Curated annotation (Swiss-Prot):
Signal peptide: none annotated. This is Hemoglobin subunit alpha. The modification Phosphothreonine is found at T8, T108, T134, T137. The modification N6-succinyllysine is found at K7, K11, K16, K40. One of its GO terms (cellular component) is blood microparticle. It comes from Taphozous georgianus (Sharp-nosed tomb bat). The lineage of its organism: Eukaryota, Metazoa, Chordata, Craniata, Vertebrata.
Length: 141
């Protein structure tokens, strides 16, 4: 459960992301594909090379979804219901991949906002991304 301090930290961190959410999403996806090559199996139709328009496009979707989640932190299940359905029933993504992408997102955010990435902000973002992952995998059960 996100505390009021966690919510404040997440909102402040996301404000600093600003218009870079899609770029950071794409960078996190690239990190994930390079660090965890098995994740590429869900994207057989994508050009996964650096700077690929398909990775950038999916990165924008990731960034937009996270922005929506930040805006609706008090109702993540409602905000992410359609996305949860898509990943559970149509795409059938292995739930562990959400944890891998979350880790890569944390690394990406830390690399771009090192001065602001305090231990408290890191912990809050980690809890937030874990909550998002839990919601996205809730329909697998």
């Amino acid at each position: 459960v996100l505390s009021p301090a966690d919510k404040t930290n997440v909102k402040a961190a996301w404000e600093k992301v600003g218009g870079h959410a899609g770029d950071y999403g794409a960078e996190a996806l690239e990190r994930m594909f390079l660090s965890f090559p098995t994740t590429k199996t869900y994207f057989p139709h994508f050009d996964l090379s650096h700077g690929s328009s398909q990775v950038k496009g999916h990165g924008k979707k990731v960034g937009d979804a996270l922005g929506n989640a930040v805006a609706h932190m008090d109702d993540l299940p409602g905000a992410l219901s359609a996305l949860s359905d898509l990943h559970a029933y149509k795409l059938r993504v292995d739930p562990v991949n959400f944890k891998l992408l979350s880790h890569c997102l944390l690394v990406t955010l830390a690399s771009h906002h090192a001065a602001d990435f305090t231990p408290a902000v890191h912990a809050s973002l980690d809890k937030f991304l874990a909550s998002v992952s839990t919601v996205l995998t809730s329909k697998y059960r």
